[in-house]
Amino acid sequence: MDAFDVIKTPIVSEKTMKLIEEENRLVFYVERKATKADIRAAIKELFDAEVADINTSITPKGKKKAYITLKAEYNAGEVAASLGIY
């Protein structure tokens, strides 16, 4: 699966901004069929950042969210800034 097909769009809200600042986490809508390994590879390819942990959930509307925790040596704020959301 192509990295651009896996990661659909970042989720920008007050809650996600707090996660970026305090927990070094990013939140994206991802392809519903994407596995955690697919998401990890896409983050590495698109943002050149190593992933420490991934939690996923499927919303009642059928969209899949990925909560991505970056390793300590990477800054989620810098990745968010490169996306233009921070």
Swiss-Prot record:
Keywords from the UniProt entry: Ribonucleoprotein, Ribosomal protein, RNA-binding, rRNA-binding
Protein name from the UniProt record: Large ribosomal subunit protein uL23
Source taxon at top rank: Archaea
Assigned protein family: Belongs to the universal ribosomal protein uL23 family.
Organism from which the protein derives: Methanococcus maripaludis (strain C5 / ATCC BAA-1333)
Function comment: Binds to 23S rRNA. One of the proteins that surrounds the polypeptide exit tunnel on the outside of the ribosome.
GO terms classed as biological process: translation
One GO location term (cellular component): ribonucleoprotein complex
One Pfam family recorded for the sequence: Ribosomal_L23
Record text on subunit structure and interactions: Part of the 50S ribosomal subunit. Contacts protein L29.
GO molecular function, one term: rRNA binding
